[in-house]
Swiss-Prot record:
Keywords: Ribonucleoprotein, Ribosomal protein, RNA-binding, rRNA-binding. CDD domains: bS6. This is Small ribosomal subunit protein bS6. InterPro entries: Ribosomal_bS6, Ribosomal_bS6_sf, Ribosomal_S6_plastid/chlpt, Transl_elong_EF1B/ribsomal_bS6. The lineage of its organism: Bacteria, Pseudomonadati, Pseudomonadota, Alphaproteobacteria, Hyphomicrobiales. The keyword Ribosomal protein applies.
């Protein structure tokens, strides 16, 4: 059997429980056709780069699949029919990655400083420093005006 990574995007207006039900439905299809589902990662509701079928957000789900090609084709056929699925992509891989995917690692980064001023290396002005005093304008002579006729 071949190894696949399968990602699908579900509509924004369905609940997370309905997304889990979709995952279970497609797991059942794969197992009925002789396949197995390894890791399932729900990446949550994320903004789309562009609108897809009038949706600006979507639920992202990653599934690691070990199944024969006909089982994968059946899952893709059912996803084409389902109106809750906006997009899907199946990629054949040599082996499945261990641990969390890159998207989950990005979410788990707690060592990054927050953007709300939690950066000790900068003052309150970013990296510019304090603003110079602008009280020197009264010391300069006014420029002569040229009257235009």
């Amino acid at each position: 059997m071949a190894l696949y990574e399968h990602v699908f995007l579900a509509r924004q207006d369905i609940t997370p429980q309905q997304v889990d039900a979709l995952v279970e439905q497609y797991k059942g299809v794969l197992e009925a056709n002789g396949g197995k589902v390894g890791r399932v990662e729900n990446w949550g509701l994320k903004s789309l780069t562009y609108r897809i079928k009038k949706n600006r957000k979507a639920h992202y789900v990653l599934m690691d699949i070990d199944a024969p090609a006909p089982a994968v084709h059946e899952v893709e056929r059912q996803m084409r029919i389902n109106e809750d699925i906006l997009r899907y992509m199946t990629i054949a891989v040599e082996k499945h990655e261990e641990g969390p995917s890159a998207m989950m690692q990005k979410r788990d980064r707690d060592d990054r400083p927050r953007r709300d001023g939690d950066r000790p290396d900068r003052g309150g002005f970013g990296d510019r420093g304090p603003r110079p005093d602008r009280g020197d304008r009264d010391d300069r002579p006014r420029r002569p005006r040229e009257d235009r006729a």
